């Protein structure tokens, strides 16, 4: 590969050769654009729009349009795109990912493709990771767009419906990934089409694309309503779990981030909860609470995974170190942590709507993204999103010196060395940014520096509000900043002259992250636009990455060398062992995300069908034929499922059939068994259908055609929403247990696809039954009103981006279990058919 790259250049270099002629054309138009009067810019926009209407393509007008934006930017905000930024703009317009280093002006680059694609009138979404950046970028760039005659909006967390509609109606809309995703879900929960806020998803430019499409790919967006479960059981399970002894009663699997009972622990559980067989399906509720209590007590760490503020448990995001207000772990884990910490236990919630970022962003006609670090995940971008990564050259060569890692035997020795390094560099006034992996480590390092008399600022989840301000001072002379992970991402660190002379920004990594990309992001904070700078990572064999995934070979070498606690080794072999541990974890995480996507694709197809049906109802389409089809389907299916063809049971079956239909759509005693006992199955179907259709026609005359059509819409919406919400829970329940199929030599994904589609078909049939039942029983006293079947109480995000697992609902009768009515048939062939 290396030799081929030397001869032909890397993939990015080859692709950039194709982009260069376009950029040459843009630069050649510079003089022409400078000669335009200010009022000509809006006229040029109108001219481009009319050329597109006459059949020209975006690529035909691109050089002139880019040159126009470049000049508009220069006149309004004093910034002129340089060549590398024009290259970045072309790459984004082509629906690719541009890897642009920190400080290369990604915010300005986005104006080029955003303007060109907004000319179609279909809207452009520019996506950032938090509200602060969305508003900042909109405010910075709005003068450019408005000078060109385009309208620009921003979606913020606290906007009402009207404000959202206005923002989405703009040519270009800034906002966060979670707001865009939640608005899509809410639009598919409205009961009147006028309440929708989004237009069709057209073109999206995702800033920090790796953070949104990879780090958060495992996170579904979830809109929740109030659940029904009691909270007492969490306290009981917590009390039981605290009585257990590690290794003897339970084991912890750090790689899987889980804990499980041993045989001895199971015996204790059976005695404590007074059950005969802990593993029995009827004890699922107990198992669920114990598993979550184990995880809360022995896997989840305070001040690393979560923190307590004003008697509330707040999740700490592992990627940014931020506390996530208003966000909760699902599946009862949050309640288990509340019980562990002795704060008030809130009720579990019920999922009303959910989608993953992977499936949300794949709905755009065209998708592109920018980040400082994408190349390490190039395969994933290509395989899952169909996006390739092009490395954009930097405007100035990178002058940062990246030193080799130093490895210590113990964490104590490592932190002592870090403090010594900080003290040494502080003396000469060099600014430092120290990256830590948790609040706990930040605070430990902070107290060590206080003892040494080194003034410093700390940036972690507890000081989230001051984030941008703190990080903007990090490049000043003698400034020491301790930050959890990637806090402050999106804010440039500018050096003062004295700081530059002192060697520029020194980056100190206190631990290797499991992803090389996160390490590269930390490094990339230094050396922006050719600034001087330096970086080094300090590693110990007690760090999580080395302990869980590192090789025993390194431990062997350290033991042979007989290293003291505060002695370090620097060697190529150690660095490559660290990198291979990281690659191992990255590969593992990619596989997990790929598998999750296979699962999510099943419910995604189902979601599309349901949302399409809802949309047709909202658009006011006449449902008359659809309702007639439902009536026929319910009547015919009832005959097929009740009449077996066994002569001795024929009379009984017909009586059951009549009883069943009387419950749904037949008035009592209208059809008697003796009226149909001499007919064939087909004749029975026709007779019943005729009776039911006549009743519905009379109802239509009685209520009035216009009114019955609206009643049909109201009822169908309500039934679809109720069934869909239960189905989301059922599918999640199926997914939780599907992994065990591997023990039966079954492919879990295939089993999930097969059973999930069976469950979906069943749900569709149940929608028909309930819709028909409600329509035949409806009594109209006043005009029907549409209302939501469940009220949204929360989402799993605040205005920042973080991760969360789906929600699960327990104790449903399995489709293949025996029916509880005592018929001796399987549930799916008996009452489950009509449930």
UniProtKB/Swiss-Prot annotation:
Keywords: ATP-binding, Cell membrane, Cytoplasm, Membrane, Metal-binding, Nucleotide-binding, Protein transport, Translocase, Translocation, Transport, Zinc. Disulfide bonds: none annotated. It catalyses: ATP + H2O + cellular proteinSide 1 = ADP + phosphate + cellular proteinSide 2. Its cofactor is Zn(2+). CDD domains: DEXDc_SecA, SF2_C_secA. Zn(2+) binds at residues 819, 821, 830-831. GO terms for biological process: intracellular protein transmembrane transport; protein import; protein targeting; protein transport by the Sec complex. This is Protein translocase subunit SecA. It comes from Clostridium botulinum (strain Loch Maree / Type A3). The gene is secA.
């Amino acid at each position: 590969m290396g030799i081929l790259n030397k001869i032909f250049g890397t993939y990015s270099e080859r692709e950039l050769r194709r982009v260069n002629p376009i950029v040459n054309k843009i630069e050649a138009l510079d003089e022409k654009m400078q000669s335009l009067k200010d009022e000509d810019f809006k006229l040029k926009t109108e001219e481009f729009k009319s050329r597109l209407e006459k059949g020209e393509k975006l690529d035909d007008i691109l050089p002139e349009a880019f040159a126009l934006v470049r000049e508009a930017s220069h006149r309004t905000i004093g910034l002129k795109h340089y060549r590398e930024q024009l290259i970045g703009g072309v790459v984004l317009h082509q629906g690719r990912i541009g890897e642009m280093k920190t400080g290369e002006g990604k915010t300005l680059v986005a104006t080029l493709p955003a303007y060109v694609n907004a000319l179609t009138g279909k809207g452009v979404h520019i996506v950032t990771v938090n509200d602060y950046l969305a508003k900042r970028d909109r405010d910075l760039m709005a003068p450019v767009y408005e000078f060109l005659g385009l309208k620009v909006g921003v979606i913020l967390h606290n906007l009402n419906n009207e404000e959202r509609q206005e923002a989405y109606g703009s040519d270009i809309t800034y906002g966060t990934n979670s707001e865009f995703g939640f608005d899509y879900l809410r639009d598919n929960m409205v009961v009147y089409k006028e309440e929708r806020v989004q237009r069709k998803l057209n073109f999206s430019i995702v800033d920090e694309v790796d953070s949104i499409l990879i780090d958060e790919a495992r996170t579904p967006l979830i809109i929740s309503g109030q659940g029904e479960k009691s909270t007492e059981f969490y306290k009981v399970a917590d009390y039981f779990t605290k009585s257990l002894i590690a290794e003897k009663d339970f084991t912890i699997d750090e790689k899987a981030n889980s804990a499980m009972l041993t045989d001895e622990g199971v015996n204790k559980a059976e005695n404590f909860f007074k059950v005969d067989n802990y593993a029995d399906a009827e004890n699922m509720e107990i198992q669920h609470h114990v598993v979550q209590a184990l995880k809360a007590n022995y896997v989840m760490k305070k001040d690393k995974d979560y923190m307590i503020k004003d008697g509330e448990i707040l999740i700490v995001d592992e990627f940014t170190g931020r506390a996530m207000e208003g966000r909760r772990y699902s599946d009862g884990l949050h309640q288990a942590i509340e019980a562990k910490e002795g704060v008030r236990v809130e009720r579990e919630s019920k999922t009303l709507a959910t989608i993953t970022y992977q499936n949300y962003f794949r709905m755009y006609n065209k998708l592109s993204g920018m980040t400082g670090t994408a190349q390490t995940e190039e395969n994933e971008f290509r395989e899952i999103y169909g996006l390739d990564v092009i490395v954009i050259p930097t405007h100035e060569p990178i002058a940062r010196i990246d030193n080799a890692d130093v490895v210590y035997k113990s964490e104590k020795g490592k932190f002592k060395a870090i403090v010594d390094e900080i003290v040494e560099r502080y003396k000469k006034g060099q600014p430092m940014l120290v990256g830590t992996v948790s609040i706990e480590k930040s605070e430990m390092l902070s107290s060590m520096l206080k003892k040494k008399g080194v003034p410093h600022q700390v940036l972690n989840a507890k000081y989230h509000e001051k984030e941008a301000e703190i990080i903007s001072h990090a490049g000043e002379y003698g400034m020491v900043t301790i930050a959890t992970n990637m806090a402050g991402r999106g804010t440039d660190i500018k050096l003062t002259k004295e700081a530059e002379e002192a060697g520029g920004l020194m980056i100190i990594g206190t631990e290797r992250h499991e992803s090389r990309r996160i390490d590269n992001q930390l490094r990339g904070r230094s050396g922006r636009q050719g600034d001087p700078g330096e970086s080094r990572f300090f590693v110990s064999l007690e760090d999580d990455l080395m302990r869980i995934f590192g090789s025993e070979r390194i431990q062997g070498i350290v033991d042979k060398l007989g290293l003291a606690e505060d002695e370090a080794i620097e060697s190529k072999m150690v660095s490559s062992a660290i990198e291979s541990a990281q690659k191992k974890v990255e590969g593992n995480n990619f596989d997990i995300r790929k598998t999750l996507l296979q699962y999510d694709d099943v419910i995604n197809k189902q979601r599309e069908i349901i949302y399409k049906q809802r949309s047709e109802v909202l658009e006011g389409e006449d449902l008359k034929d659809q309702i007639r089809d439902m009536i026929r389907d319910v009547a015919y299916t009832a005959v097929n499922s009740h009449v077996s063809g066994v002569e001795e049971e024929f009379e009984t079956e017909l009586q059951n059939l009549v009883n069943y239909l009387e419950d749904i759509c037949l008035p009592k005693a209208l059809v008697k068994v003796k009226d149909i006992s001499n007919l064939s199955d087909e004749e029975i179907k026709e007779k019943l259908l005729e009776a039911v259709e006549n009743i519905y026609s009379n109802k239509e005359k009685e209520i009035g055609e216009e009114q019955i059509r609206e009643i049909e819409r109201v009822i169908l919406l309500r039934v679809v929403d109720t069934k869909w919400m239960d189905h989301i829970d059922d599918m999640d329940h199926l997914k939780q247990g599907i992994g065990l199929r591997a023990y039966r030599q079954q492919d879990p994904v295939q089993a999930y696809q097969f059973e999930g589609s069976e469950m979906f078909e069943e749900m569709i049939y149940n929608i028909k039954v309930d819709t028909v039942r409600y329509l035949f029983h409806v009594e109209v006293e006043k005009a029907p009103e549409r209302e939501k079947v469940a009220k949204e109480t929360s989402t799993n995000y605040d205005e920042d981006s973080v991760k969360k697992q789906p929600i699960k609902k327990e104790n449903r009768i399995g489709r293949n279990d025996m029916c509880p009515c005592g018929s001796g048939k399987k549930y799916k062939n008996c009452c489950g058919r009509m449930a």
